[in-house]
Amino acid sequence: MPTLMQLSNDMKPLTFVEALRNFKSAKVLLVGAGGIGCELLKNLLMSGVKEVHIIDLDTIDLSNLNRQFLFRKKHVKQPKAIVAAKTASSFNPNVKLEAYHANIKEDRFNVAWFRQFDLVFNALDNLDARRHVNKQCLLASVPLIESGTTGFLGQVQVIIHGKTECYDCNPKEPPKTYPVCTIRSTPSQPIHCVVWAKSYFFPQLFSNDQESDGIIDNVSANEMERREIAELARETTELNELRSSIGQSDNGFEKIFTKMFTKDIVRLREVPDAWTYRSPPKELSYSELLENAEKATSPWLNEQNVWNVAESFAVLRDSIRRLALRSKSSKDDLSFDKDDKDTLDFVAAAANLRAHVFGIQQLSEFDIKQMAGNIIPAIATTNAVIAGLCITQAIKVLQGDLNDLKNIYLAKRPTRVLHCEKTCKPNPYCPTCSFVLLQLGVNDKNMTLRVLVDDILKSRLHYSEEVSVLNDKLIYDPDFDDNLDKTFDDLGINPAKNTILTVLGDSAVEKDDDGEEATRVPLLIEVTFIDSNSTEGLPYQILSNATSIPLKQQPPSNSPEDSQVLTDEINEVNDFSSSERIVINLDEYDIIVDSKTSSHNKQLKRRPSNDTLTQEAKSKKQAKIHTM
């Protein structure tokens, strides 16, 4: 089987039959045993692959059973990876399976461990873990098949170091945060009310930890937000004084409700000039709602319905009673869980009551569950399609024809559901894949940092004096040379664990356009242990040929004209990705069709003369799917 180092654009590709034969003898790693992971594991075993290692940190939840077909009700709370391997083994007993109930970021899953695999498949729903696997595969020079789905949409991306874009070549949109001022005082969207109910109201009643889960952003609070935070602290003190009365009688609930939905709303409405350009909030009456709630008939039985105000009141009262009983019988704080009916009822009812107060659209409990639990709707058919495409792309990788590799997108289009595009070359400005890897074999744990800096970096690799070395933290730079005479062992650099050091610095022999020492791309040094007989009397041996380290490229600065084109292109991408519009490409024009109106309601929009999207515009387009 050709290794990744042998793959090139000039290599004569294998036939499909030869590639399939290679695939059957491959050793692969599957990261994630969820919706896509279950489908992928089934495909791998039915394809007859030689050996599969599967890793997942999660346990099986009741909500997984409708789409993760390897699991049954009896498996709830058991490790996903272990159960998936055990269940799937019946598909093909000849395949060697090894499962890990573990975090892929653990030290034991280092670069050397990744190198044992011919292919890695990512089936994750976690951005941080995806980036970690992406980096490990780049360092190990192992092809990665990245995949993701959301609803009816999905994508498959092939990542090969030095040949294609990596996962981080196109920036991903960060998770949204909401200013505390908006959440506390001026909500305007249903999500604002959901965040308030989940991250403020619920913790104040049932948790001793007064910090939110990070959704309410007060780190960079301005003066107005600082006042809001102070007001929040005052109200928190008042609310804490009422916590002891929760669950004792309806009197306790009345005090809580009156404070949150009557007194606080009246106080907020009296803020000067706050409601000049928006409708003021309207407080709720406890006695009026109590009377109407008696007529409500189990509104929580149907989570698809939108409750009226009286029904939300009834659900909130009952959920607080249930949660109060649980809180008294448990020493631990209660926390929100999307699959915990009691906590979900509380958040849904509180969010809808607050939405009614501010004249905001109210939602069903099902919709609020998606928001509060950050749930991306999962569809089993989408997972199955994407898993099948992962296998076809994996076989293409083993064929060795890099020119035929495609990134594939599953999308709702008028004429087709699959859209393919050729893989792009790596982004030269990407901070993740723009590096050079050097393997350094060490036979003596007493080798000092001075040997690395003076002998290897400066003498052999021609770094200037401006060089820095980092492990988990900075261990050397020109202004911090205290560690030069310390050994690798003293500094926690363990060759047995394949420690990765990062070197940042300038070249002593190359100059930039201004005649200054030019900055190089990061050098990553993988420190491994080797036998002393192979080092010719030195405490180390350079095992790879990283003698040429390219210069770091700087992104070009955009002129005002370029910025306007970029803005137009990003708007074009937003039009493309909108669920309410369909974009039909016709040479230099786009016809934008509003899918909610007549098919004749079209806009004709000329493209910029250069119809290739700039890197930033392209990034935004891809980010909409890559964050799945």
From Swiss-Prot:
Pathway: Protein modification; protein sumoylation. The dimeric enzyme acts as a SUMO/pmt3 E1 ligase. It mediates ATP-dependent activation of pmt3 and formation of a thioester with a conserved cysteine residue on aos1. The modification Phosphoserine is found at S559, S563. GO terms for biological process: protein sumoylation. One of its GO terms (cellular component) is nucleus. Belongs to the ubiquitin-activating E1 family. The keyword NAD does not apply. InterPro entries: ThiF/MoeB/HesA, ThiF_NAD_FAD-bd, UAE_UbL_dom, Ub-E1_IAD_1, Ub_act_enz_dom_a_sf, Uba2, UBA_E1_SCCH, Ubiquitin-activating_enz. It comes from Schizosaccharomyces pombe (strain 972 / ATCC 24843) (Fission yeast). Residues 597-628 are annotated as: Disordered. Pfam families: ThiF, UAE_UbL, UBA_E1_SCCH. ATP binds at residues 32-59, 64-67, 80, 125-130. PROSITE patterns: UBIQUITIN_ACTIVAT_2 (PS00865). GO terms for molecular function: ATP binding; ATP hydrolysis activity; metal ion binding; SUMO activating enzyme activity; SUMO conjugating enzyme activity. Gene3D superfamilies: Ubiquitin activating enzymes (Uba3). Chain: B, domain 2 (1.10.10.520), Ubiquitin-activating enzyme E1, inactive adenylation domain, subdomain 1 (3.50.50.80), Ubiquitin-like 2 activating enzyme e1b. Chain: B, domain 3 (3.10.290.20). The lineage of its organism: Eukaryota, Fungi, Dikarya, Ascomycota, Taphrinomycotina. Disulfide bonds: none annotated. This is Ubiquitin-activating enzyme E1-like. Keywords: ATP-binding, Ligase, Metal-binding, Nucleotide-binding, Phosphoprotein, Ubl conjugation pathway, Zinc. SUPFAM superfamilies: Activating enzymes of the ubiquitin-like proteins.
